[in-house]
Curated annotation (Swiss-Prot):
<dbReference type="InterPro" id="IPR020845">
    <property type="entry name" value="AMP-binding_CS"/>
</dbReference>
<keyword id="KW-0067">ATP-binding</keyword>
<dbReference type="GO" id="GO:0005524">
    <property type="term" value="F:ATP binding"/>
</dbReference>
<dbReference type="GO" id="GO:0016208">
    <property type="term" value="F:AMP binding"/>
</dbReference>
<dbReference type="InterPro" id="IPR042099">
    <property type="entry name" value="ANL_N_sf"/>
</dbReference>
<comment type="similarity">
    <text>Belongs to the ATP-dependent AMP-binding enzyme family.</text>
</comment>
<dbReference type="InterPro" id="IPR032387">
    <property type="entry name" value="ACAS_N"/>
</dbReference>
<dbReference type="GO" id="GO:0005829">
    <property type="term" value="C:cytosol"/>
</dbReference>
<dbReference type="GO" id="GO:0006085">
    <property type="term" value="P:acetyl-CoA biosynthetic process"/>
</dbReference>
<dbReference type="InterPro" id="IPR011904">
    <property type="entry name" value="Ac_CoA_lig"/>
</dbReference>
<feature type="binding site">
    <location>
        <position position="539"/>
    </location>
    <ligand>
        <name>CoA</name>
    </ligand>
</feature>
<dbReference type="InterPro" id="IPR025110">
    <property type="entry name" value="AMP-bd_C"/>
</dbReference>
<dbReference type="Pfam" id="PF13193">
    <property type="entry name" value="AMP-binding_C"/>
</dbReference>
<feature type="binding site">
    <location>
        <position position="516"/>
    </location>
    <ligand>
        <name>ATP</name>
    </ligand>
</feature>
<dbReference type="Pfam" id="PF00501">
    <property type="entry name" value="AMP-binding"/>
</dbReference>
<feature type="binding site">
    <location>
        <begin position="206"/>
        <end position="209"/>
    </location>
    <ligand>
        <name>CoA</name>
    </ligand>
</feature>
<protein>
    <recommendedName>
        <fullName>Acetyl-coenzyme A synthetase 2</fullName>
        <ecNumber>6.2.1.1</ecNumber>
    </recommendedName>
</protein>
Length: 687
């Protein structure tokens, strides 16, 4: 597309809205909870114009309250004191376990897909109630009470879910720490949350490899006196696990001492249910605080309406409980609705790339929710496995974690869904608690690349980042913000409410700042651009880095691409592109980290750079062409698969000494190599 032809939200003009496939309706256990877009519009309008009536009714319909609330909401975004369901009392574990166990104790709650498929098992709601009660009894015997924080550092096993619900049963606050974090990162989070109890396991198993979980905990707690008790589940049963007398206790020994039922502790709707740490741009990670009533309702509503989940369905969320996706859509959402959830311990590549599809076939999963990163991996190296399995049970394919490119959306729909499923591209974040923008399966026509429409109560808007003014109408681009509170939004940052205000509410007073850029197309559909700081302004042209990355990725040799903006005296900002190459693309080790080792049959780096620049010029326009293209072995990513563009931006700006918190990186070894590559490339450019 040339500069003259560049349109606002131009992708929307290149795709057609997709109607719901007939297979979706034929395979439903019952009618859709929202029948069509007109019903959505009616419900959405009520949720915005009369949120007290809408959410008051939904809260009483979806949740069990020990004490009814007196007021639906109070406070505002401007003052940062939002509250929902005032004076109401409830318990999250009761809502997710007890009420379903009382109705049908033999119904399956958890389907466990272990690293080794021979270890698979299921947990019924009756069994889950007993296990949660027993672990809660252990914690109670150690003095854990309402408001205390308990750290959970476990792999994706049913006992991680049991631990979280046991903490919630006591009205305490769980702080789940991803089991891939280092001992130092674990220590920082335990100390910040002041967790006196840690729940962990002896070892973990992932991708056929052993993770020394308890050893990492011991290293993290060396010299830290805040923790008084550690509960250790025997995942592998390996001998020689060090246990500190008086502090460390075996799960199986302690639960034997407890009764099979412990009454839940009712808490106020605004009492915290959990805190979850996210990476900050500088300094230490921030513990985002979610509250019981609002969060639980958001989880239940979005699971029901976005995915059109029925009690008979099986939801396979391929996300870890160490992240918000696992919290909301592997645990609280499905279990609150009494729906079976698949807990997956392994990786999509172990023991082979057919693992996801065997899981779906074996358990007749109806819903599959996964990050685009995993689908890109399978598209590249494991696509041939898909056709070997019967995936006809699927009705809904979800995408989470980052915007899904239209071509990957199409591939996902065709190869995994056989064009029979609804593809739900969901936009949300740790701080939102549940979906912000997403199609309602069966009701909203979808568009490849678009997250579509706001969920109920999400008063979404587009703000001009320069003027701060709200942009009215359609065909607009800017910053995505929310202009009224919603139940599941985070209330604060643990022990640092000022940081919460500064990060989310101060940038645009009266609005919640998502940090994402977005466009609203001619149909009112939203297209997510990624983080606002991932928008580059070159000579007055606001360019989405995702758009440039998509153009780079169309080159036959590019495996992954990431684009950042750096200051430029002439154009204001300039585009810097980082690319890694596909295996076997005539590269040997010919990256910018090792530019001299080019084999005779490879494409020279300078030639490749020119091709990539021309690719972007042809796809978008001359104004979008990268000023520098840097070839690296790999890009820095979080453990949830997101590329850390902030890190690339800092390195490109010669601020490698200001990288901030890197604890969420899955591959920290990439950073020194990228620093060297950037230095070599920029020095070369000055010669």
């Amino acid at each position: 597309m040339s500069c003259k032809e560049h349109k606002v939200v131009h992708e929307a003009h290149n795709v057609e809205a997709r109607k719901t496939p007939d297979h979706f309706y034929r395979s439903q256990p019952g009618p859709s909870y929202v029948q069509d877009i007109e019903q959505y519009r009616t419900m959405y309008q009520q949720s915005i114009e009369d949120p007290d009536a809408f959410f008051g009714e939904k809260a009483r319909e979806f949740l069990h309250w020990e004490k009814d609330f007196t007021h639906v909401r109070a406070g505002s975004l401007r003052t940062g004191d939002t509250a929902w369901f005032l004076n109401g009392e409830l318990n999250a574990a009761y809502n997710c376990v007890d009420r379903h166990a009382l109705e049908n104790p033999d119904k399956v709650a958890i389907i466990y897909e272990a690293d080794d498929e021979a270890d698979n098992r299921v947990v019924t709601f009756g069994e889950l109630l007993r296990q949660v009660s027993q672990v809660a009894g252990v914690l109670q015997s150690w003095g854990v009470k309402k408001g205390d924080t308990v750290a959970v550092y476990m792999p994706m096993i049913p006992e991680a879910v049991v631990a979280m619900l046991a903490v919630a049963r006591l009205g305490a606050v769980h702080s789940v720490i991803f089991a891939g974090f280092s001992s130092g990162s674990l220590r920082d989070r335990i100390v910040d949350a002041e967790s006196k109890v840690v729940i962990t396991c002896d070892e973990g198993r992932r991708g056929g490899k052993t993770v020394h979980t308890k050893k990492i905990v011991d290293e993290g707690l060396a010299g830290v006196g805040v923790v008084s008790h550690i509960l250790v589940f025997q995942r592998t049963g390996s001998e020689g696990i060090p246990m500190k007398a008086g502090r460390d206790f075996w799960w199986h020994e302690e639960v034997r001492k407890q009764r099979g039922y412990l009454p839940p502790v009712s808490v106020n709707a605004e009492d915290p249910i959990f805190l979850l740490y996210t990476s900050g741009s500088t300094g230490s990670p921030k513990g985002v605080v979610h509250t019981t009533g609002g969060y639980l309702l958001g989880a239940a509503l979005t699971t029901r309406y976005v995915f059109d989940i029925h009690p008979e369905d099986v939801l396979f969320t391929a996300g870890d409980v160490g992240w918000i996706t696992g919290h909301t859509y592997a645990l609280y959402g499905p279990l609150c609705l009494g729906t079976a959830t698949i807990i997956f311990e392994s990786t999509p590549a172990y023991p082979d790339y057919g693992r996801y599809w065997r899981i779906i076939q074996r358990h007749k999963a109806t819903h599959f929710y996964v990050a685009p990163t995993a689908m890109r991996l399978i598209k590249t190296v494991g696509e041939q496995e898909i056709s070997k399995y019967d995936l006809s049970s699927l009705r809904v394919l979800g995408s989470v974690g980052e915007p899904i490119a239209p071509d990957l959306w199409e591939w996902y729909n065709e190869k995994v869904g056989n064009n029979n499923c609804v593809v739900c591209d969901t936009m949300w974040q740790t701080e939102s608690g549940s979906h912000l923008i997403a199609p309602l399966a069966g009701a909203i026509p979808t568009k490849p690349g678009s997250a579509t429409v706001p969920f109920f109560g999400i008063n979404a808007c587009i703000i001009d980042p320069v003027t701060g003014d709200e942009l009215e109408g359609n065909d607009v681009e800017g910053v995505l913000a929310i202009k009224s509170p919603w139940p599941s939004m985070a209330r604060s940052v643990w022990n640092n409410h000022d940081r919460y205000i500064e990060t989310y509410l101060k940038p645009y007073p009266g609005y919640y700042f998502t940090g994402d850029g977005a466009g609203r197309d001619h149909d009112g559909y939203y297209w997510i651009r990624g983080r606002v700081d991932d928008v580059v302004n070159v000579s007055g042209h606001r360019l989405s880095t995702a758009e440039i990355e998509a153009a780079l990725s169309e080159h036959e040799g590019v495996s992954q691409a990431a684009v950042v903006g750096i200051a430029d005296e002439l154009t204001g900002q300039a585009v810097v592109a980082f690319v890694s190459l596909k295996e076997g693309y005539g590269r040997g080790s010919s990256t910018d980290t090792d530019p001299e080792s080019i084999a005779p049959d490879v494409v020279p780096l300078d030639t490749l750079r020119r091709e990539l620049v021309l690719q972007v010029r042809a796809e978008i326009g001359p104004f979008a062409a990268p000023k520098s293209v840097i070839v690296v072995d790999d890009l820095p990513k979080t453990r949830s698969g997101k590329i850390m563009r902030r890190t690339l931006r800092k390195i490109s700006a010669n601020e490698a000494d200001q990288l901030g918190d890197l604890s969420t990186l899955a591959n920290p070894e990439t950073v020194p190599a990228i620093i060297a590559a950037v230095g070599a490339q920029f020095l070369k450019g000055k010669k």
